[in-house]
């Protein structure tokens, strides 16, 4: 591109527009995004456990941090809910302005200082690439990460999301665990479990592992730590495999039954409505089609 050509800005604008259209019209990408919106969320409560990515923004004293979103302040669960609302408007809204606001909020969720998903004061990617001064590379983390062993704080987070702090767990993703230096993914006596811990290859020199998998069955919960995968070539030539170590998190005092799970509750609810329907037919409240 000639830097002295007057038409260059228009050329670049058209180029960016075409690039945008390629992304928006990509069938596979749209299918993936649709899947994320239909199955995903800012957090999930599953079988009495709280799953989220990043952190719950906290003040240094452990109280929930107030974050301003569109002129109003939110904290704790309400912050997650309002951010998810806007993220969904960014995809589903018919009004162009409303959809644009939602898309701006998705950007904020990714890199905003008050975002639970980001959890830092700033993103210093630019500084790390282009500035030699290491001081500019620092990304100050939210106070949450210093309070992972605080039982009162972890209990208040579980209660904020409507869970029993005596039995529930927090399953926390996107937190590197430096196992190479003896750090454990099990925090606060087993109330908080980290399941990322180095899954990304970029973190593996720092963590010494390739992440964790949480396994939960009728008898208990355990974390499986995975060794980094070297390469396909090494796996063939050396006949090596990915080795994993298990860490027992909790053994249940009694075995969990299907009825104790969210799936079991859904089955029980379906049984209830089917029995109600059957009773209505038997009593003649609903007439059979002949």
Region roles according to the model:
Residues 1-290:
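Feature recognizes metal-dependent phosphohydrolase scaffolds
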